[in-house]
Amino acid sequence: MPQLSFHSPVGDLTVSEADGQIVSLDWGWGRDQEETKLLRRARDQLHAYFDGQRLAFDLPIAPVGTPYRCRVWAALRVIPPGETRTYQDIARTAGGSARSVGGANGANPIPILIPCHRVVASRGLGGYSGGDGLPTKRYLLDLESRTLAATGRPGGP
């Protein structure tokens, strides 16, 4: 499976492709580097995101999971940048419980592109399995808020 690794402010990231679609984004450096046009495009869009120049991604993705997890991940993709929803909010949309939404979030194969960092507990941030955990989640949420404020788009202060 072609994959491309690169440095980011939240650590090294590896994006993988199968059949012309992004199938995973993992923390760490991948062993089997094979650049493709799509992987370069993904890397460039992620760099622009981290540079505060982009909030949305225009990439074909194909997360692999159970039908329930796929419903949860679809619900995450409609949360606007700079905003959050609670696990319970997502459960109302996708079905199941807040706890099952947390399980689907933890199994998200394409974090950042599928913005599981925008889901929070009703009494705080909740958890985050990517990078350094909660500091990474805080960083991503703060980055989106700063980008919105700098671009003057709705949702900025």
Language model region names:
Residues 1-96, 143-157:
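Basic nucleic-acid-binding alpha-helical/helix-turn surface characteristic of O6-alkylguanine DNA
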Residues 88, 102, 138:
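Short glycine-/small-residue-rich flexible loop motifs, especially phosphate/cofactor-binding loops
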